[in-house]
């Protein structure tokens, strides 16, 4: 029986491509540069701010995920997993945990800024720094003590897997409750993303109508412009995977035969979610004087026409 499972896993391996190696190298380098860059910026930011705390937590999420990337690269290059099945489950689950935690912090940042806009407040912040630290510590305790052990312990438990092959847990999707949970997550993420996009477009349209000629002199406009970076990451990195996931779930759960091309495309879309590590670079870049000058110049050209 184990031998049968091993051969089946081998035949169901997605197409190996050097593009995945290149992508993860780019993610690793860009992610590290982003983490280092944002650290210099965080020193000057208000640590009681809800937005700042969300950004700090983003740094932590990206940093932990980036620690697992070298293991993925080693596997992709050598085509053999040498670190044991339990650690394979952790590294595999970490890509999903990274995506959803990043999405969660984006929602926190965007909703906070929407509240600031609609309630006409200068900022939303914790009463004391200790409260901000406690909120973050509580969340990470929940993730470390409950979420990670639960995911790793329940991840890939229904079938036997070859310890030399990693990230091949698609057969778990054949189970009804696993499929239902996946569909619920996909629908939730897509719905929240669409709502955030609608709010963002509405806010920017309001600002353009109200402050047409003095738009660029308002700090709130630049804050809302930064929001577009986060919305852009969601649209480019997360939503393609979520939409393809619907098709992938349908193919995997309704077919006994292995479709290596579908598995390959699923792996590509999932890997693209890791590019969200570049959000920290975009955050730093969006606050730079050079970027503001370019936007001002572009806006003046539009008004002149």
Curated annotation (Swiss-Prot):
Glycans are attached at residues 5, 9. SUPFAM superfamilies: Family A G protein-coupled receptor-like. Residues 44-50, 111-131, 205-227, 289-305 are cytoplasmic. Residues 1-22, 72-89, 153-183, 249-267 are extracellular. It comes from the Eukaryota. The chain crosses the membrane at residues 23-43, 51-71, 90-110, 132-152, 184-204, 228-248, 268-288. Keywords: Cell membrane, G-protein coupled receptor, Glycoprotein, Membrane, Receptor, Transducer, Transmembrane, Transmembrane helix. GO terms for biological process: inflammatory response. GO terms for cellular component: plasma membrane. It is found in: Cell membrane. The keyword Transcription regulation does not apply. The keyword Cell membrane applies. Its main location: membrane. InterPro entries: GP183-like (IPR047160), GPCR_Rhodpsn (IPR000276), GPCR_Rhodpsn_7TM (IPR017452). It is a multi-pass membrane protein. GO terms for molecular function: G protein-coupled receptor activity; oxysterol binding. Orphan receptor. Belongs to the G-protein coupled receptor 1 family. This is Probable G-protein coupled receptor 141. It comes from Homo sapiens (Human).
């Amino acid at each position: 029986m184990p031998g049968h499972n091993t051969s089946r896993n081998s035949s169901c391996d997605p197409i190996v491509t050097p593009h995945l190696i290149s992508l993860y190298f780019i993610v690793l380098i860009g992610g590290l540069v982003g983490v280092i860059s944002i650290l210099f910026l965080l020193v000057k930011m208000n640590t009681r701010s809800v937005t700042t705390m969300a950004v700090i937590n983003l740094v932590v999420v990206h940093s932990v995920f980036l620690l697992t990337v070298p293991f993925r690269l080693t596997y992709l290059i050598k085509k053999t997993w040498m670190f044991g099945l339990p650690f394979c489950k952790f590294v595999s689950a970490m890509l999903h945990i990274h995506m959803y935690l990043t999405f969660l912090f984006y929602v926190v940042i965007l909703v906070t800024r929407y509240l600031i806009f609609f309630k006409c407040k200068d900022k939303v912040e914790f009463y004391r720094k200790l409260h901000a630290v406690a909120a973050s510590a509580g969340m990470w305790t929940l993730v470390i003590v409950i979420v990670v052990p639960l995911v790793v312990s329940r991840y890939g438990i229904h079938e036997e897997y070859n310890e030399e092959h990693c990230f091949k847990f698609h057969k778990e999707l054949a189970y009804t409750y696993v499929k239902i949970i996946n569909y619920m997550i996909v629908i939730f993420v897509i719905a929240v993303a669409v709502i955030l996009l609608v709010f963002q477009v509405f806010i920017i349209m309001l600002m353009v109508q109200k402050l047409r000629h003095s738009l660029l002199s308002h700090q709130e406009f630049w804050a809302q412009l930064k929001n577009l970076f986060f919305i852009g990451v969601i649209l480019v990195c997360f939503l393609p995977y979520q939409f393809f996931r619907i098709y992938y779930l349908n193919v995997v759960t309704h077919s006994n035969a292995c479709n290596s091309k579908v598995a390959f495309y699923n792996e590509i879309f999932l890997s693209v979610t890791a590019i969200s590590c570049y959000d920290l670079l975009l955050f730093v870049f969006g606050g730079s004087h050079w970027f503001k000058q370019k936007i001002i110049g572009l806006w003046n050209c539009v008004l002149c026409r």
